[in-house]
């Protein structure tokens, strides 16, 4: 059982870092240095904030495992696991919506009446194979966009599964003992045994 909490903490930290990196990379489309390509949107901010929640949850879980006598670490872990569970479906929904609508093209459909979103100009879901060169600048933006959204879908689902596992184990301990941190019986060195 002790390996479960360590593994879950490490998984949450690793996937949280990947999620933050995904949001930061999405900030600069196709690694472009052109400042007019940068911009905040809900698609970029959601992976960053969900990744920050996962990193915080993972670090608290690892610290709670290491210093199990500190009651506040277990309670903070439980709180952040709940927040992470609430953020993961939102992250998943935004990534799915973004993948289905298509990429945000900066110059393809812009203008006086343009919306900049290909999702409003082409059929739904976005036909990546039939309409490969809709975004003229930056090049290969469709593939870049689809790869980032697929990565976000996988990250959000894995973060949700890991957070749910930790939540279920901590909830079982809370129901069984009346609190998250348990008193150790004499001779039991493992604070995380059920």
Curated annotation (Swiss-Prot):
Keyword entries, A-Z: Membrane, Transmembrane, Transmembrane helix
Keyword Isomerase: no
Transmembrane keyword on record: yes
Transmembrane segments: 11-31, 44-64, 76-96, 99-119, 148-168
A cellular component annotation (GO) from this entry: membrane
Membrane topology, record value: Multi-pass membrane protein
UniProt subcellular location: Membrane
Protein name: Transmembrane protein 212
Organism lineage: Eukaryota, Metazoa, Chordata, Craniata, Vertebrata
